[in-house]
């Protein structure tokens, strides 16, 4: 072969070889991904490296004790990694495997259940698991019910026997979802990425049920190459304590002698069911994190980031953690939860019963995403938990275990038991309305009212209804001095306005086309008689009670302790199972309940209620006693005031028609006490003559002694100077 021919042949052979490598690489990749969760797009600069555990079994599938991952532990009992090193150098990355796949297994018909609905002394719930994704099929509580009727039926059955009520009456916390004709269990596995090869683990045949015991259910998924050689195993073991806690012990075992880079992706807590009445949809996604304080232990924060369900469904897919602010502040994730009005599912790192262990979740969950499915009005939000890319050394184990809380938002549990205390999960209990009312709801005030109501119920009157009435008396007593002063000021103001009415009429006739002049002269007259509108504090007691009403609204709406609790020792339920005030957290249902809620405007009406109607009548009567003297200076203003009074009588009851009956009971009682208080103050005023205080000529220029009077005088003086300055500007003329 000539030299010239070799120069032509060698490049041709190199091109053929390179093309062959590209084609083999392209056609040998197997796509196992699905589109249920948004793909991770963030890159990770460094990867954790997990070195081999002391003992690693590559074929262990017999019992949970043998198959459960064995990791090294520190003094606190938490699994640790032997070493972590920087592996940013591309040449140091593990070599790619051939085509990987998931070993398939036969389906089992055996029930996969932990807990019980019958043994109340031992279990609080019953959890069903599924081979699909080795996740949770459903969780149902044993002693928490959907409705008051269901609660009464089951309590009667358990005490007196008879026909067993339906299991459907017990509260269903979570159920598997069907998305695009595919079953999605809660907290089920989604996929694993090994050396950039994505392997779907969401099918039932991907998992082998290794063992079923009363204290745990163990699943195994095996990753093999094209030669059927086992490359890795994924272990998932579910256990249940005797309260509302579950433990998910899961790990990835590298069965080879070389390093592999893995990333774990699973489903997180989904959106929970909405309340039956749907008065307000308060489903939320919550986060707890430690502040980035250079490794120092910091309080776990949570209330600054609350993702409402209504905001989550605006985007069909989104990344909800980390946020822009959390990246800037270097916040470290500690827990993630999905909640509705009364319940929550939270995931968090492993912490012992003594509250010891790391509170950081970042080595297991680096990113959280959402996907929205379902038609408008019936959306479901699925969440995805992405682990960081981690290098697992040959024979090593990557532990991705986590704890789970699946229970009520009850502070007696979250504020007194571990590991919830260490993680500050008590902040899941948030007595706060959303949207515009969020800034009006003072969390500290709602917490204080919760303490007062709880003390009254447990140690004083032993009934939530009477506790609310006593709370009314406490608040009205505190506000009585202000109420009395406002009533006296209202009476004095009314008498002065009656005496000044002829003078004001003269001013209107004198300046018919200059209302500002009339208003200014009227202010001068009021100043001469020692009164001003700021002294008329007739609405101040109501405004001071508004924060209490809003805080109490949020408290009674979200407080689990009041859920399905009756008022006045259940006396109304003794009359033929009358549902009136059977549940202070829902409407009063004076005329019974509807089997299916009826849609009306923004609410689902669950029954016909009487307390809001009585509240409207009380408001009307209250205006007769506490309305201040009208300051209308024109027919238009007078008609506007009438409209406002009518709206208060009509709109308040309409807005609160489906509100918790505990709140309407509070407002109704407070308004009734206010009328009686007003009558007593009026009798006191009538017995003491109150005459207008006419200012002396030498006192007209002096400022009043009271704060309101001084503020009024300063405002009038500033207004007078402003008018004078404008008059001077208008009188200036430019000469030619």
Q: What do these predicted regions represent?
A:
Residues 11-25, 552, 613-617, 650-651:
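Core hydrophobic alpha-helical membrane-spanning segments
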Residues 461-463, 654-664:
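Transmembrane helix interruption/hinge and helix-loop junction motifs
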